[in-house]
From Swiss-Prot:
InterPro entries: Ribosomal_uS8, Ribosomal_uS8_CS, Ribosomal_uS8_sf. GO terms for cellular component: chloroplast; ribonucleoprotein complex; ribosome. It is found in: Plastid, Chloroplast. Part of the 30S ribosomal subunit. GO terms for biological process: translation. Disulfide bonds: none annotated. Keywords: Chloroplast, Plastid, Ribonucleoprotein, Ribosomal protein, RNA-binding, rRNA-binding. This is Small ribosomal subunit protein uS8c. PANTHER family: 40S RIBOSOMAL PROTEIN S15A. Its main location: plastid. One of the primary rRNA binding proteins, it binds directly to 16S rRNA central domain where it helps coordinate assembly of the platform of the 30S subunit. The gene is rps8. Transmembrane segments: none annotated.
Length: 129
């Protein structure tokens, strides 16, 4: 059984990117679904869909003739053994605003930009660039 579903999701995306695979299948949780929505709205993935009750399929994006991945890096920040919380003033900017931080706040899971606009802090789930 998977202990950290978010880390598993990020690892599956990272491995598929390295192999230039277009679709990734993973177990579906409510947090994974919300992260998939954020990845799609921010333009990091092409699309996502629920394949069944228990699985989620992401379609990854590549650019150019050499099929370079849009996602160059994914990093899990807050883990089960070491939680990382930030205040509204400490919300991280990834690569000076070129990347995205996904933060779990009291108003739900959102990007770093949304958290700054709403003046919310929370748990930093992962960084994407």
């Amino acid at each position: 059984m998977i202990q950290d579903t978010i880390a598993d999701m990020l690892t599956r995306i990272r491995n598929a990117n390295a192999m230039r695979i277009y679709t990734v299948c993973m177990p579906m949780t409510s947090v994974a679904r919300e992260i998939a929505v954020i990845l799609e709205t921010e333009g990091w993935i092409d699309s996502w869909k629920e394949a069944s009750v228990n699985s989620l399929i992401l379609r990854l994006k590549y650019r150019g003739a050499k099929q370079q991945p849009i996602l160059t890096g994914l990093r899990r920040v807050s883990r089960s053994g070491c939680r990382v919380y930030v205040s509204a003033k400490e919300v991280p900017k990834v690569l000076g605003g070129m990347g995205t931080a996904i933060i779990s706040t009291s108003k739900g899971i959102m990007t770093d930009r949304e958290a700054r606009n709403h003046r919310l802090g929370g748990e930093v789930i992962c960084l994407i660039w």
